[in-house]
Design a protein with these regions (language model features):
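Acidic, low-complexity intrinsically disordered segments
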Residues: 2-262, 269
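Radical SAM [4Fe-4S] cluster-binding motif and immediate context
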Residues: 195-367, 388
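Aromatic/hydrophobic pocket-lining residues that form the small-molecule binding cavity
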Residues: 61, 118, 165, 259, ...
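Short, solvent-exposed turn/loop segments enriched in Gly/Ser/Thr/Pro and often Arg
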Residues: 83-84, 140, 280-285, 308-309, ...
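Catalytic cores of alpha/beta
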Residues: 145-151, 316, 377-391
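C-terminal accessory regions of radical SAM enzymes
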Residues: 2-55, 218, 366, 381-451
Length: 451
């Protein structure tokens, strides 16, 4: 048996954006590695990668690759991140031609924003290589009824897919239900896939000054998040099974020993200049956070992390700084406390967040604040309050996006049922459903400008 773990190309057409730039640029999709797959106009173009276009590491795909390699042998497992490579469709199919006789199973991770594109590609792949058994993973697997008419699909995997991939390789097909790694299994599993072709293909601009360091290693120190934000996809559909937000969610953290060996190997082999912990929430609890700081203090390179404002003691931020952390991303979502509590269900005190952001900055670290607009039940006035909050807090940098509605997250189910965990979330005439947060944001910008 043999399997190809693929993150295929995802290109749109060439466009220009009024008020931004006149030269047409390619619309490029980001799929595996992104919690909310989206498209945007990039400097990259087919077969010509721009080194500083945002590109995340495809985490689930990378872990599943090495897990399969351990079980069935490296010679029977293939990996290719065509988005990281900025590969054209022509080059992608040329590569498939070189391995077609070695491949039995073909795995693609997908989600609603990319599914229309991906299914067309799957039909083309199946037409050219009819012996391929197509496996679909990713958040799209949480709603298998959307895929059951697709005769080209051999198996649909729910959740993170190391163990479920092996079930298919051992003969199972159809819908494969959740089977997550236990904490012990996770810490005994191999580290994710890196090689000489892909190691320098991942990049993020923020938090500053991360963009000045290259190459960047994007990694996880944990899986999952105990919080239940309405729009968050992975904790609800990949590292857990909680589409309505009414079940207990947990975080599984990698051990200090696992992470020390992992990071040490990456730095030694690929000479990474910085580490970005792209966890759902890196700093859940002081012990794990301090453990990671002790590791990074040994390696003496700058690092960055995806954090929450209130999940560690105040003094732990200084420990992070002293171990080389130069910046963090903090999800705030809205500048209106009612929206944060009753729609998002984040329960993050905005006044405390303002205080902690100023403290983090006083240490010499940057803070990249992330906000979302167009939540169900959110008013235009609420959105303008978010704008005001951003101006008052003075984050180093800010990310503003439209709220993406992607399968697996509670937001996706809101139009089907009332969800008690999100009492103020409602589908009304003000709410716009959209799976691509980038495109939704551009529509909202025009709307807010007219207020």
């Amino acid at each position: 048996m043999s399997i190809f773990f693929s993150n295929p190309p995802w290109w749109g057409g060439k466009e220009s954006r009024k008020g931004w730039f006149k030269r047409k640029r390619w619309r490029r999709g980001i799929r595996a590695g992104s919690r909310w797959p989206f498209t945007s106009l990039n400097k990259s173009r087919p077969d010509k990668r721009h080194i500083k276009d945002y590109t995340p590491y495809p985490y689930f795909l990378g872990y599943a690759t090495t897990y399969a390699q351990r079980k069935i042998g490296k010679n029977h497992v293939f990996f290719r991140d065509s988005i990281g490579l900025s590969e054209s469709y022509k080059s992608y199919f040329n590569f498939l031609d070189t391995i077609k006789n070695k491949i039995e199973y073909f795995l693609l991770e997908s989600a609603t924003p990319s599914w229309e594109h991906d299914y067309k590609l799957i039909k083309e792949i199946k037409g050219k290589y009819p012996h391929f058994k197509i496996i679909i993973a990713g958040s799209i697997g949480s709603v298998p009824e959307k895929l059951q008419h697709c005769k080209e699909i051999h198996a649909i995997l729910k959740g993170e897919y190391e163990k479920n991939t092996l079930k298919v390789l051992n003969g199972e097909k159809g819908i494969i239900d959740y089977d997550l790694l236990t904490l012990d299994e996770m810490n005994q599993s191999p580290t994710p896939y890196f090689d000489d072709l892909h190691f320098d293909k991942y990049f993020d601009w923020n938090p500053v000054p991360m963009s000045k360091y290259f190459p960047q290693a994007h990694i996880w120190g944990s899986r999952g998040c105990p919080f239940k934000c309405i729009f968050c996809v992975w904790p609800a559909s990949m590292t857990g099974n909680d589409p309505d937000g009414d079940k207990k969610r947990t975080v599984r953290q990698y051990t200090k020993e696992y992470m020390k060996n992992f990071i040490g190997t990456l730095i030694e082999k690929y000479k990474y200049q910085t580490i970005f912990f792209d966890d759902d929430t890196f700093n859940i609890g002081n012990k794990h956070t301090v453990d990671m700081c002790e590791i990074m203090n040994e390696f003496k390179i700058p690092w960055f992390a995806m954090c929450r404002a209130d999940s560690i003691r105040k003094e732990t931020w200084k420990i992070m700084h002293d171990s080389g952390c130069q910046g963090v991303k903090i999800g705030v979502e809205s500048g209106n406390q009612y929206v944060v509590d009753k729609i998002v269900n984040k329960h993050l005190d905005l006044n405390y967040t303002k205080e902690i952001v100023q403290y983090i900055k006083s240490l010499g670290m940057s803070v990249h604040g992330t906000f979302t607009y167009g939540l169900p039940g959110e008013t235009k006035a609420n959105m303008l309050e978010t704008k005001k909050y951003i101006s008052e807090v003075k984050f180093t940098t800010v990310q503003e996006s439209g709220t993406a509605e992607i399968e697996g997250a509670p937001l996706y189910n809101l139009n089907k049922k009332d969800l008690s965990v999100y009492p103020a979330a409602k589908i009304d005439s003000e709410y716009t459903r959209h799976a691509d947060g980038s495109k939704k944001w551009m529509d909202l910008v025009e709307s807010l400008q007219n207020k």
